Amino acid sequence: MATNGVYIVMGEANCVVALLNKARRQYQLSQVPTLEDTDPLLRNFTDLKEVLNEVADLADMNPQTYLSPFLDVIKAQNTNGPITEAALAAVAKFLNYGLIDASSIKAANAVESIAYAVVHTKFIGGKSTGSDECVLFKILQVLRSLLLSPPGILLSNEAVCDMMQSCFRIVFEQNLSLLLRKAAESTLADMTQLIFTRLPTFVEDTRHPYIRQLVNPTEKRQKRKKKRQLSVHIETKAKEPENVPTEMTKLIGEAAETAETDGAANLGYDVVLTTDPPVDTVTHPDPPIEEIIKLAEPISAGDEADSESEGGGGEEHHERPPVRAHAGLQREIVSDEEEIDTEQTVGGEEKMPYGLPCCRELLRFLITMTNPVDRHNTESMVILGLNLLIVALEAIADFLPNYDILMPLIKNELCRNLLQLLDTNRLPVLAATNRCCFLLFESMRMHMKFQLESYLKKLQSIVLTEEKQHENGGGGTEQKEMALESLVQLWRIPGLVTEMYLNFDCDLYCGNIFEDLTKLLVENSFPTVGGHTASLLSLDALLVVIETIEQNCEDRENGRGEVAKEQEHKDLKKLGLPVLSGYDLAKKMAISTGGKASPMPVSSSIVLRSNRHAPSTELPSMSQIIEQKKRKRLIAEGTELFNQSPKKGIAFLREKGILGHDEQSLVQWLRTNPQLDKKAIADYICNRKHAEVLNAFVKSFPFENTRLDVALRMFLETFRLPGESAEIALVMQHFSEEWFRANNEPFFHVDAAFTLSYAIIMLNVDQHNPQAKRSQPPMTVDCFRRNLSGTNDSRDFDPEMLADMYQAIKTEEIVMPAEQKGTVKEDYMWKVLLRRGETAEGSFYHAPTGWNDHDLFAVCWGPAVAALSYVFDKSEHEQILQKALTGYRKCAKIAAYYGMKEVFDNLCIHLCKFTTLTSMRDGGAGGGADEDVDLSAAALLSHSSSPEAVALAFGENHKAQLATRTLFYLVHENGNILREGWRNLFEALLQLFRARLLPAELTEVEDYVDEKGWVNIQRVHQKELPHTRNDSGLLSWFGLGGGASEADRRKPTQEQLSSMKLASQVISECRPSQIVADSKYLTSTSLAELLSSIAANSAQIVEQAEPQQKTASLSGEDEDALVFYLELIVAITLENKDRLPLVWPHVRRHLEWLLSPRFGRCPVLVERAVVGLLRVANRNLFRDNTVSDDVLHSLSMLLRLSPKALFIFSRQIAFGLYELIRANAANVHKKEHWAVLFALLEAAGAAVLPDDYVMMTTTEKQQQSLRVGGDQQQQRMAYSDVEGASGRGGGAHEERAYTSEGEERRRGGYDSNSDLESRVDSAGSLLGAQKQPADWIHLDHKDAAKATEEALTALGANVVSSKKNFRQFGSLVLRNGLGRHEPAAFLKVCECLAFLLRDAVHVTPDNFESSLQCLRTMVEASLDGGVYAAGPLSGDAQNRLRSNVTDEKAVKKHHHHHHGHKKKELCTDVTEDADESRNEEQQLIGNYQQMSLHLLDLCSQLHSQTPAIFAKWAQGASPAASDLATVAFIWTDIWRPLLQAIGRLSCDCRRGVRAAALTHLQRAFLPANMATLGAAEWQSCFGEVLFPLLTKLLEPFSQMDPIGMEDTRVRTLQIVAKTLLNHLSALSALDSFPDLWMLLLDYMEQYLRVDSCGNLNEAVPESLKNMLLVMDSTGIFAATPRLYDVTVERLNKFMPELIKDTIPNPPRPGQQQSEASEPKKEHASGLEPPPPSSNSTAATSTSDPSIATAQSSISTASSVVGPLVTCPEDAGISAPIPIQHPLTEVIVHSGPTSPIGSPPQTEPPASSPPQHQHSEHQQYEQYRQQQAAAAQQYQQYNQNYPQQQQQQQQQYAYSPEHAAYYQQQYAHQQQQYAEHYANQYQHYQQQQQQQQQHPVNPTSPSVHGQYSVANPLPLPAHPAYHPIVAPSVNSAFTHVYTPPQNNAPALAPSAPTTTSADSPYFTPIPYNPSQQEKP
C-alpha cells in the first residue's frame, strides 16, 4: 500500500467532483440550492473528504468507505462518459497502488463491490463512438486490474464469471472498433491465464454447492427432475433521463439483446448442455488437497487412483454425474432488481473465493465456443475460444489431469470439438486447432490414448485427402502443409515417437500409427510440382526421428543420463517488479499461499531434452514388446480371415496359440477386437453349435443396475442381430436370462424379461421403420403399456418404467451404428472410443527417452533413406543437399551404434551412386541426378572415359563431391559394420585410381628390385581424345578453316584445369588411404567381408572382360585394376599382421587365382602377385604359429609357374627371397619349408626347370644325338675370360621381362598385352643353355643361334653315344635341366647363399641338404662365366627394376618422334647405349668370376667345417644330427657333393676359377681333412669325383688357352696320383683295386695322347713313375696277384720304357711284408693342411653334356671300375668348358729318385728346413736362363704358325678394345715380374744365411720324399687373381700374381704357404711348339 494513499484518494475525488460540477453547469437552466444538498453523488464525495481529513492512513478505514462514492458514479445512469471514465480510472489507480489490503477482513466485500459496479456500469453515450469506447476500454482495464491484483483472489466464482461475461460481450459486439475488441481479447487472455495458472492452488471442496452438484449422485437424480435453471440476466436497461439524447446503457443493452436473440448459444442463457457419462464409467476417488498442491512433481495415475477425496467420506467409488451446466457462465440465482449488498452475505454465509467452479465453468464455456456443430458459433468465436484454450493449456496443462471435474470435459467435448474442427477449410481455425491439440497431447496424452490416435489418423487423412484433391486439379495444399507441420512438431516432442510406437504399433488392436505415418511422410517427401514445402516438411519429420535417435545414441555413448535438472522459481515477492501478466501474479499467489510453483527446466545446452513425463512404473520389457508385435501380426491376419470365414479365422488363431480352446478367451477376443465384422460375429455366436460361446458372450456384459432397454442397447451394439426369428429368439433368451440374473430378478419370472426384451425390439421397429409407419400409425405409450399388460407373471410392469423405456426408444433408435453413416456413426464411434479409454486397454505408457530406438529406427530407416536419396538426387539447393547428407550421417551413426549392417551398407551404396564413380566403367557419369551433366564445356573431354574426363566430370559435379566426402567420412567413422558396401566403395576407389586422383599412398607400392624400394602402379594408356568439332566444311577442305592446331584443341582450358585440381583436392581431403590404415581396427567379420569384396570385384572385372577377350589377354586398364585391387589386399594384410589367421585364407585364395594360368598373358599382374606373396611372407614369418607355416608353404605356388614366368619374375623372386631370408632365416624351422625356399632360389637364380621340362629336354637331346655325328664337337664356339664379350649382348633386349610399349614398337617386338611366352627371346626356348649359347659367343656367322645350336647338337651326339658305356660312372654335372637365368637374380641368390652358409650360423639339420643342393646348382649355373645367363646385365638394372614412371620431358621428347610411345611402367628394360653396354659386360665378367670364387670358398668352408657343425649339433642334442653323424652319410651327402662342385669348377673355362678350384680340391684331399673315410668311401671318391674330373678334362674346355688347359690337366693328374698314394694302403685292400689301377692307367694313356704343349708329356711319366715306385716299395704288386703282369702289359702299350726305369723285375713274394709299412709311416707323418680361406660367397651351376674324346680307352676301363660307383641312367657328362691359363703343380717324388729341379723357394718348416743344392746366385741365373729360353720358344712358335694365329683372330674376332686391354694387362704383368724378382732375390739371400747357421743333413730320416721345384715363383696371394694374356703376347710363364681389378673387389689373402709334402709348387715347362698340333 502506498504511504500517501489518503492524498491519492483525495485527488481522485476532486477530479471526479470537478467533472460532476461541469456536467451540472451544462444542464442546469435555473439557479437552485447548492448542489451538495440536492445531488447524492456530490454529497457522497463531500462526506468522503470529511472522513479523509480526519484519518492519517487509509489502512484505518474500511475500503468500502472510499470506494463507494466512485462506484456510485460508475453505476449511476445519469453520468456521461468522461465522468464514468474518471471514476473507473480512480478505481484502477487504487488497485494498481495496492490501496486495498488483501489481508484485510473487509477486502473481500470491497473487491466484490468493485466487480459488481464495473460489470453494471451505466453512462450516457456521447456523440462520437470513440469516447464511448474509451469508457469501455477503461472498464476492461479495471476488470483486468481487479482480477490480477492481490485482492483479486478474494473474488467469488459468480463475480469472476460476471467479469468474464462482460469482456465476452465486448468481444462479440461487431459494432465496436477492432482495437477495442482486440483489447477485450487481450484482457480475456490475461484473466484466463491467471485463473488456470492458479489451478494448482484450487481444491475440490465437496462442500461447495457447485462441486456437490457434480459429484453427489443423490443431487444428480434430484436435479434431473427439477426445472432447468436459467442463467442470470445481467441488467442492461435503466430508466432514461428525458433530457439525455443518447442513452449510455444502449451499448451493453444491445449487446445483451444480441446475445439473447442472435447468439443465445454463444453466451447460452437459455441453452443447457447435458453430458451424460460414458457407459460403465467408474470414477476414482478425488485426490486429496495436499497432493493437488504439490506442484514440484506431477501426480501419476497410480497416485491419483490410490488417493481419496477429502469430502468423499468412506465411499470408494462414485458414479460420475451428468455435467448439467448452462452454456453461459453460471452464477447464483438472484433477481434482476436486487442489487448485491457487499456488506452482507448471501444465504447467511460469506461467499467463498473463486476456485475450481469458476475454472470449470470457464473451461466449459470455452469448449462450447469451439463446437463446430453449433451453427451460432461464428469463425471469430471459434478462434477466440481456441486461443483462450491455448492460453489455458500453455499455463497449466500438466495439472489439469489432477482434477476429475475437469478431465471429462477435456476427454469428451474438447477432443471431440477439436477433431471435428480439423475438417474445416478455414486456415486460421485449422492452425489454432492444431496448436491446441499439440499442447493438449503433449501434456495429457497419458489420459487420452485413443484421442491421440484419432488425432494422428485425422492428420493422415488430411494429407491423403489433399493429395487426391491436388491430383484431381483441386485447390492448394495449405491444409496438407499444416498437417505435416503439426506432425513435425509432434515428432519433436521428446519421447513421443517412442511412446507412439509402444502404445499404438505394439498394441494388439490399435493401428500401426508410427509405421503408417512414416510411409506417409516418405510418400510426401518426394518433391512434386507445387509441393516443395510439403516435401521439405515431410523430410523434416523423418529427420526429426533420425536426429532424436542419433542424439540418444550419442548421449548413451558419452554417459549422459536423461535426468533434467529442475529448479524452483525464486521468491517472486522479493522482486519489486510490476505485474506483467496473470501468469506472474499467479506465481506470486501460489508462493504466498504456501504452494509451490510449477517446475521449470533449467536451460542448458548440455542437458538432453528428455521426456518431461516420468516413465511408467509397469513398462513392458523389450522381449514382451517383440512378442506383442508378433502377436499383433498374427491377430491382424486372423481378423482378416475371421471376417471372411469365422470358423477358419478362429482355427488359425488357435493354431498359432493366440486363442485358447476355452470360450472365455474367444469371447474376450470378440469383445475387444474392434476390427471384427459385426455380422461375422453374429453368424458365429448365433449358431446353435456354438451355444456355449453365446452363453459366455452374454455373460461378459456388466448388466448390473442397468435398465433393460439400456442393457439391450449395449448388447445389440456389439454385433448385428440376425434376421431369422429363431435366431433372434435364441439370442434374446440368453440375454434376458443373464440380465434377469444380474439385476437380482427384478421381475416375477424370467419370461417377463424375455417378453419385455422382445417388446422393446418391436417398439424400435414400430417407431423407426418407414414401412411400418406407412402401414399403421406408431403406437403410443398407452398402447405399449397395454401390449405388455399381464406379461409379468400375470401382473403388469411398472408404468413409469415402461414410460421411460418408451420415451428412450422413441427418442433414440436402437441401431447398428457401425453400419450407419454421418453423425450416428460418429457418435457411436466416439462413445466406443471413450468406453475403450476407461478400460485397461486405454492405459498409456510413458517411456524413457530412447527406450526403444532400435525398433523405431528399424521401422523408419528404409523409408527415410529412400526419401533422402530421392531428395538428394532431385534437389539442387545447397541447404537441402546438406540436410540430406546430414540425415545420411545420422542414420549411419545410429546403424553403427546398433550394429545394423544392412542399413549402413544401404547408405554407402546410395552414396556411392551419387559419387558418379561406380558407373564410370560403363563410360558415363551416370547415376541419379548426374545423368544430365553437360560436359560440352570440356572441349575434347566430352563423352570420353579418359582419366582427364573422369577427373573433370568429378571436379565440376558439386553434388558428387559432397557425396564422396560423406561416403569416406562414414567409412572412416563406422567401417566396422560395413559389409556389402565394401564392393561399391572399392569400385569407386578403382575409378579414382583410373582417374589418377588417388594419393601416392595407394599408388606407390613396395618393390624389391627398384632402387627406390617402391614403384608406381599407375600406367598411362593414352588414347586419341575426340575432337569437339569436325571442321569438314568447304573452308576446311581448302585449308582455310580450323585455325587452331591439334595441340591447341586438345589442351584443356583453365577452368577445366581448375576443376581437375579441385577434384584431386577433394579426394585428398577424403583420405582414402586411411581405409587401409584403419583396417586393423575393423572387426573380424568386416575385415573378412572387405577382403572378399575386393576379390569379388576382381573376379567381376575378369568376367566382364572374358566375353570379348576369351583368347586374348586383359586390357591394360583391366590389368591395372586387378593390380590395384591386389595391392590393396596386400596392404591390408600387412596392416593386419596380428590377425593373420583371419586374413590369410582370403589372401591365399586370391593369390592362387592370380598365379593361375588364366593370367599367363598379364605379366604385370602376375609380377605384382609374386611380389605381394613375398611381401606377406616377409612380414609374418617371425610369428610362431600354423599360419606362418602355411604362408611359407604357400611360396610353393611360385614353383608352379611356367619356366618362362619364373624367368621373367626371377629378379623379383630372388630379391624378395633375399630380404625374406635375411630377416627371417632364424624363423624357418621345418625341413619342407627350407626345401621350398631353396627350390625357389634355384628356380630364380639358376632357372631350374620342373621335371617334365627336364624330361622333354633330355628327349630332344637324344633325338638330336641320333642325327648328328660326334665329329662336330670342335665347332663349339666357347670363349675364355681372356676373350672379349662385346658381341654377347645381341639378344639382350628380347629377353627382358617387360618393356614399355614404346620400346616394343620401335623394335617391332611384342606389345604390352603379349603373354609370358613372348617375353623371352624368339631364338630359342629357356629350356637349357645348350640350345642358346650363341648369345654369349660372338661369331662371324650371320645366324649365331643356328651355328651355336649345331655345335651343341654335335656335342650332344657324343654324349649320348658315350652314355651307354659310362653308366656306372659318376658325373660332375651338378644339376640337370637348367634354363637360362637372369644375371641379376643369379647374383642375388648367390648373396643369399653366402648369408646363409657363411660361418654356418644358419645351417641346421633341416636345411643342410637343401642348401648343399642349392649350392651345387648355383655352381653349375656359374660355369664358364655365365654361359647359362640370359644376357649381360643392364647397368643399374642389376640392382633395380625400371618400373617407375619416366619423367615428362623424356616422354614428350620421345612422343615427338614416336606417337606410339607410352611411359615405362612396371617394365624390365635395358638401355641401348654402346658404351654403357660395354661397361656392363665388363662388370658382368667380374661379377660372375667373383661369385664363382665365392661359391668355391663356400664349398671349401663347408667341407672343412662339417665335423665342427655336426659336433655343434650333437651338443645341442639334435636328434637329426645324431642320426646323420655317420661316416657314410657325411661322405655321401656332404663331402662328395662338395667335392663334385669343386671339381666342376675345376673344368671352368676361366683360368683363375680353375686354379682356385684345383687349390681348394687339393686342400680337401689332404689326409687330415678326410681321415675318417674308409676304403669304400675313397673308392667312391675316385669313381664319382676324380675319374669324372679326369674325363671332363679330356675335353677341349678352353681352346684359346692351350697352355692353361695343359697346366690344369697336369695339376689334376698330380692330385689324383697324390690321393692314390696317400690312401694306397686302404685302397689296396679292396678287391676292386686292380680295376681302379687299370682305369687310372687308361686315363694316363689318354692324357699322354692328348694335344700337349709338352707339360703333359713330362708330367704323365713322372706321375706314373712315382706311383709305380711307391706301389713297388710298399709291396702292392707282391701282395696282389697278377697286378704286376697286368700293369706291365698295360704300360707296354704306351710307355714301355717306364717299366724298365721303375719296376723292371717282378716283385718277390717275401718283399711284401718288409716294405708294406713304409707308406703307412709316410701317412702317419703327413702335415696338417694350411687353413682355408675365410671368405665365402654363393653361386649357382648348370649342367653340360659329356664329351667322349677317349671313348675307346675309357670304355675299356669302365668295366674295371664298374663296381666303384653307380650313376643314374639319365645322368650325362657335362659339356666341354674352355679354360684360359695353365697352372703348374707340385710333382711328388716318393721314390729314391727325383727329377732334376731347383730347390724350394719358400721357407721350409721348422722341423726340417730344406737344404739348398745351389747358391743363391746360381738359382737366380738359372731362372733367367729359363725365362730367356721360354721367350725364344714363343718367338719360334709365332714364326712357325702365323697362319694359325690369323685364323684364331678371325674366328674369335678380337675387337680393338680387347687388344688394348690385353696389352695393358701384359705391361702390368711385366712390372709385377720385375718387382717379384727383386723381392725373390732378397729372400734367397736370407735363406742362404739361415742355411749356413743351421745346416741340415740331406739324408735326414724325417724327409720321406724328394721335391723338385721347376718354377721359382710362389703361390699367388689368392687363387682368384690371374693375368689376362692377349693371344699375341703369350708367355711361357703363365701364372703370376695380379692385383684386384676395378671390377672385382679385393678379397682377403689366403694364408702364407709353407713348404711341406703337400705344398704346391709351380713347374715351368718350356713351351714346345713341335708338340702342339695345329688346330
Swiss-Prot record:
Renumbered to this chain, the Pro residues biased-composition regions fall at: 1797-1808
GO annotation, cellular component aspect: endoplasmic reticulum exit site; endoplasmic reticulum-Golgi intermediate compartment; Golgi cis cisterna
Keyword Transport set for record = yes
What is its subcellular localisation?
Answer: Golgi apparatus, cis-Golgi network; Endoplasmic reticulum-Golgi intermediate compartment
Record flagged with keyword Transcription regulation: no
Q: Where is the composition biased (Polar residues)?
A: 1264-1277, 1895-1909
Which GO molecular function annotations are given, in alphabetical order?
guanyl-nucleotide exchange factor activity
| Stored Pfam families | Sec7, Sec7-like_HUS, TPR_28
Q: Which GO terms describe its biological process?
A: endoplasmic reticulum organization; endosomal transport; mitochondrion organization; regulation of ARF protein signal transduction; secretion
Low complexity bias located where? 1734-1751, 1820-1854, 1877-1894, 1938-1957
Q: Report the principal subcellular site.
A: Golgi
Q: Which Gene3D superfamilies match?
A: 1.10.220.20, Arf Nucleotide-binding Site Opener,domain 2
Q: Which residues form the SEC7 domain?
A: 624-812
Q: Where is this region: Disordered?
A: 216-243, 299-352, 1264-1318, 1447-1473, 1699-1751, 1788-1854, 1877-1975
Q: Enumerate composition-biased segments (Basic residues).
A: 221-230, 1451-1464
**What PROSITE patterns does this protein's entry cite?**
SEC7
Stretches with biased composition (Basic and acidic residues):
1291-1309
Q: Which InterPro entries does this UniProt record tie to the protein?
A: ARM-type_fold, GBF1-like_TPR, Mon2/Sec7/BIG1-like_HUS, Sec7_C_sf, Sec7_dom, Sec7_dom_sf
Which UniProt key words apply to this protein?
ER-Golgi transport, Golgi apparatus, Transport
| UniProt note: phenotype after gene disruption | RNAi-mediated knockdown at the L1 larval stage causes cuticle rupture, mostly through the vulva, and results in lethality in 50 to 80% of animals upon reaching adulthood. Most surviving animals that reach adulthood are sterile due to embryonic lethality, and in over 90% of surviving animals there is an accumulation of vacuole-like structures in the body cavity. The few larvae that hatch have severe cuticle formation abnormalities. RNAi-mediated knockdown at the L2 or L3 larval stage, results in reduced lethality in response to oxidative stress induced by paraquat compared to wild-type.
Question: Could you tell me which PANTHER family the record lists for this protein?
Answer: GOLGI-SPECIFIC BREFELDIN A-RESISTANCE GUANINE NUCLEOTIDE EXCHANGE FACTOR 1, GUANYL-NUCLEOTIDE EXCHANGE FACTOR
Write out the function statement from the record.
Guanine-nucleotide exchange factor (GEF) for members of the Arf family of small GTPases involved in trafficking in the early secretory pathway; its GEF activity initiates the coating of nascent vesicles via the localized generation of activated ARFs through replacement of GDP with GTP. Also, plays a role in receptor-mediated endocytosis in oocytes and endosomal trafficking. Involved in vesicle retrograde transport from the ERGIC and cis-Golgi compartments to the endoplasmic reticulum (ER). Plays a role in maintaining mitochondrial morphology, network organization and function.
Entry protein name: Golgi-specific brefeldin A-resistance guanine nucleotide exchange factor 1 homolog
Q: Which gene encodes it?
A: gbf-1
